A protein has these predicted regions:
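An extracytoplasmic/periplasmic, membrane-proximal ligand-sensing/linker region
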Residues: 36, 162-177, 184-201, 213, ...
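Ligand-binding pocket segment of bilobal, Venus flytrap-like solute-binding proteins
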Residues: 68-70, 76-83, 153-234
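Short, polar/charged alpha-helical segment
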Residues: 36-54
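C-terminal lobe and pocket-closing loops
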Residues: 217-274, 278-279
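Short, well-ordered beta-strand elements
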Residues: 22-36, 55-59, 149-153, 275
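N-terminal segment of the mature folded domain
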Residues: 64-120
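A bilobed periplasmic-binding-protein/Venus flytrap-type ligand-binding module shared by bacterial periplasmic
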Residues: 112-124, 255-267, 290-291
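A conserved helix-loop-strand patch within extracytoplasmic ligand-binding domains
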Residues: 100-154
Length: 330
């Protein structure tokens, strides 16, 4: 028996390894059509495939159709980056009915919105970290069409954030300090106005959000309204086009979750556990999106850049043996 023991142990280890792989099986992952989501989906695919032995497959997805399909059909298995506010009631019901699980936060800070100014302005005028400081120095923010006014860059027309930005502009009486709302016309117009100001070290003030390539490229400071977050006010008035008497409130973070089906979580507990720990800060995601844009890279190329250059981040999400397998596959 003593001669057989090592062989039996080896067979047992091999059987356990094969069981882990078959336990995971085929995993379908929604590949959403924006940059941070396709990056996360590719990272998940690679780690599940090479670290956990899953047969991981990316399938096209988007917020509403993916969430609905997961609830009604149990597919795909994973939605890596779901901005859950837009279908919160349906997701909560899916969890209650044991069809879905909130696995973790894809973006640990949540989606971040606010009014921003360049960091070099705050270095020169520290009081401009606050809305009162910005109003005090309103004349620095040159209007491209009217020298008598100051420029506030809002969301492009038709975007939901145009409503909230306009209501907050009114709530803080920015017009009373000489500011005028500028419609940049498009996302490119808005980001281009920041790039132009930064290249010339000029004053810029307006709405923006994270995670984005722009906030990865340019050091911007979110202006403090001095109001804190009033979620009730934000939902009932700030975001409503017919809000007559808006009050100041900072933007509440938008929850950004990773959602899995209950069937996947039950079938593949080790792989599911990875999703409970995997999450990006906005600062890290901003940097990755900036690299992605500068290099005209797709989700897969940016995934390799991330795994090869940020091991201190992703190795904390997985056991040591899984990390070694992933590193060996790079």
């Amino acid at each position: 028996m003593t001669y057989k023991t090592p062989l039996l142990l080896a067979i047992g280890v091999l059987a356990a390894t094969n069981a882990n792989a078959s336990e995971c099986g085929t995993v379908t992952i929604a590949d959403m059509n924006w940059n941070s989501a396709t990056l996360i989906a590719n990272v998940d695919r690679f780690i599940l495939e090479h670290g956990y032995g899953c047969d991981a497959e990316l399938i096209p997805g988007d917020t509403m159709p993916t969430g609905t399909s997961m609830i009604e059909k149990g597919q795909p298995d994973v939605a890596p980056e779901l901005w859950s506010n837009s279908l919160k009631d349906a997701l909560d019901k899916g969890v209650e009915e044991k069809r879905l699980r909130y696995a973790g936060k894809a973006l640990v800070d949540g989606g971040e919105e606010g009014f921003w100014i360049p960091a070099y302005l705050v270095k020169q005028y520290p009081e401009m970290k606050t809305i009162e400081g910005v109003k005090k120095h309103a004349k620095l923010f040159s209007h491209p069409e009217d020298k008598a006014k100051s420029a506030f860059y809002s969301c492009p027309a038709g975007w939901n954030c145009q409503i909230s930005a306009g209501n907050l502009f009114k709530a803080m009486d920015l017009a009373g300090s000489g500011f005028d709302i500028i419609d940049p016309g498009s996302s490119a117009g808005l980001s281009g106005s920041i790039a132009k100001a930064y290249e010339r070290e000029e004053a810029w003030f307006g709405y923006y959000w994270a995670p984005t390539a722009v906030l990865g490229k340019y050091d911007m400071v979110k202006v403090d309204f001095g109001s804190g977050v009033d979620e009730k006010e934000f939902v009932s008035c700030t975001t409503q086009a017919d809000c007559e008497n808006p009050k100041p409130t900072m933007y509440p973070p938008s929850p950004v979750h990773t959602i899995t089906t209950e069937e996947f979580a039950s079938r593949s507990p080790a792989a599911y556990n990875y999703f409970t720990k995997r999450g990006f800060t906005n600062a890290d995601m901003n940097q990755l999106l900036a690299w992605m844009e500068d290099n005209q890279a797709d989700g897969e190329e940016t995934m390799f850049h991330f795994l090869e250059n940020y091991p201190q981040i992703w190795t904390a999400w997985v056991p040591q043996d899984v990390a070694k397998k992933v590193q060996g596959a790079l």
